[in-house]
């Protein structure tokens, strides 16, 4: 569930739009995790939109996805969000102003994610228009390409 102002959007698991990805460490890269959540179309201030958030890989010292329960990560500035290439899509991809994401639980191949922050609602406005958002979602855990098929996604 995504809440922006009084508008609510539900997760969209179709077309592999939503997932919690865990990448195991290898000889060249440390372990990391990432989050993509697409939301079903809905009304937002008279427009039908299909918002999404992309949080790119976050390095971790954890060796299994289950160990990530309780993990948090924060971005405090637009510049940091731009550097990481994290974004929120409403009308167009925009960096986030700030956010905090937490892994609340991992159960039955799903991750319970909570993310709160401030997004850029309209990047064309001068100055841009900001708005708070809240996400509380269960999304599929993907550790390998085969997981998509196992989860029938």
Where do the PLM segments sit?
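Acidic, glycine-rich flexible loop segments
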Residues: 72-135
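An ectodomain-focused feature that recognizes extracytoplasmic/extracellular
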Residues: 1-91
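Residues in flexible loops and secondary-structure boundaries
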Residues: 12, 63, 109-111, 143, ...
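A sequence-composition feature that detects small, non-aromatic residues
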Residues: 25, 31-34, 107-111, 125, ...
